[in-house]
Amino acid sequence: MSDHQNASSAITLDRLDLHQPMRVVDIQVPAEQPEWRLWLEEIGFIPGEPVCLLARGMPGGDPLVVRVGASTFALRRAEAACVRVEAAS
């Protein structure tokens, strides 16, 4: 989590433009959903991992289709909002 203190340019995954190459900085889950952290980490959202938003569902933008590493997942906006990312270098 030390990255998050240095990552002033970090934004949450749900706010990305489509096809923008990023990397995971950290995960910040709501207090009422602590189990989301482990679940997101288990499916590959770990610091340094490449991530890209591929598509948004309609209406309302749910779910989001996200590629992390070599895997593709559908996430709800609330879940994607827990993943902080920054531009891939």
Task: Locate each region found by the language model.
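Compact, charge-rich alpha-helical regulatory domains located at protein termini
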Residues: M1-E41, I46, C52-M58, D62-S89
